[in-house]
Amino acid sequence: MKFAVIVFPGSNCDVDMFHAIKDELGEEVDYVWHDTENLDEYDAILLPGGFSYGDYLRCGAISRFANAMKAVQKAAEQGKPILGVCNGFQILVESGLLPGALMRNENLKFMCRTVQLRVENNETMFTSQYEKDEIINIPIAHGEGNYYCDEETLKQLEENNQIAFRYVENPNGSVSDIAGIVNEKGNVLGMMPHPERAVDELLGGAEGLKVFQSILKQWRETYVVNA
């Protein structure tokens, strides 16, 4: 399986994402600059955290216009797994690939610590290696991670089982404790916590690795078993 890590000006978690795929998952991965127009050779697309374009205007508001996002949109339409973490989640929302918005944290402070998440839906291509309601420890590092959507959108997220992760103790004011959501098709996941920073027991825990293992399992079942 071949992954692409999209690198925007100001990305700073791309190296962590690359390490998670290459060294921990053991799969092929490339850094791909934001001006690329073709992602056809990749099986999965990863949008890392950071401060793309300095977070000017709004987090992700400029990145959504990058050439690469047209290719990401195409990949999403093709059903390829798209994972956006932290700033990557913000970019997915700004691009319209996921509903809602990310606002300033409720306490108006940047937050950097490990939090507990509850796996709400383990039937997605990103969460199949977890148990439903499993509690996992994943780091956060954000100033604008307060997820918001209107009541109708929240109702749709609930009814369609699109909420992948919830905070056990809400750190930022996100509506309904939401930490991560998928699109209706189930192949686009956005989450504020950083699973790529929780892939090595020597560095504090590996409970985020299952996100990437789930992607790999889905791909193998689809393209290897059926080959």
From Swiss-Prot:
Instruction: List the EC numbers from the record.
Output: 6.3.5.3, 3.5.1.2
Q: Which reaction does it catalyse?
A: N(2)-formyl-N(1)-(5-phospho-beta-D-ribosyl)glycinamide + L-glutamine + ATP + H2O = 2-formamido-N(1)-(5-O-phospho-beta-D-ribosyl)acetamidine + L-glutamate + ADP + phosphate + H(+); L-glutamine + H2O = L-glutamate + NH4(+)
Cite a single GO BP annotation: 'de novo' IMP biosynthetic process
Provide the Glutamine amidotransferase type-1 domain boundaries. 3-225
Example of a GO cellular component annotation carried by this entry: cytoplasm
UniProt key word Cytoplasm: yes
Active site (catalytic residues)? C86, H194, E196
Subcellular location, in the record's words? Cytoplasm
Protein's UniProt keywords contain Coiled coil = no
InterPro entries xrefs: Class_I_gatase-like, PRibForGlyAmidine_synth_PurQ
Q: Which UniProt keywords apply?
A: ATP-binding, Cytoplasm, Glutamine amidotransferase, Hydrolase, Ligase, Nucleotide-binding, Purine biosynthesis
One GO MF term on file is: phosphoribosylformylglycinamidine synthase activity
Tell me the pathway.
Answer: Purine metabolism; IMP biosynthesis via de novo pathway; 5-amino-1-(5-phospho-D-ribosyl)imidazole from N(2)-formyl-N(1)-(5-phospho-D-ribosyl)glycinamide: step 1/2
What does this protein's UniProt record list under function? Part of the phosphoribosylformylglycinamidine synthase complex involved in the purines biosynthetic pathway. Catalyzes the ATP-dependent conversion of formylglycinamide ribonucleotide (FGAR) and glutamine to yield formylglycinamidine ribonucleotide (FGAM) and glutamate. The FGAM synthase complex is composed of three subunits. PurQ produces an ammonia molecule by converting glutamine to glutamate. PurL transfers the ammonia molecule to FGAR to form FGAM in an ATP-dependent manner.
Oligomeric state and interaction partners are given as: Part of the FGAM synthase complex composed of 1 PurL, 1 PurQ and 2 PurS subunits.
Protein name in the entry: Phosphoribosylformylglycinamidine synthase subunit PurQ
The root-end lineage is: Bacteria, Bacillati, Bacillota, Bacilli, Bacillales
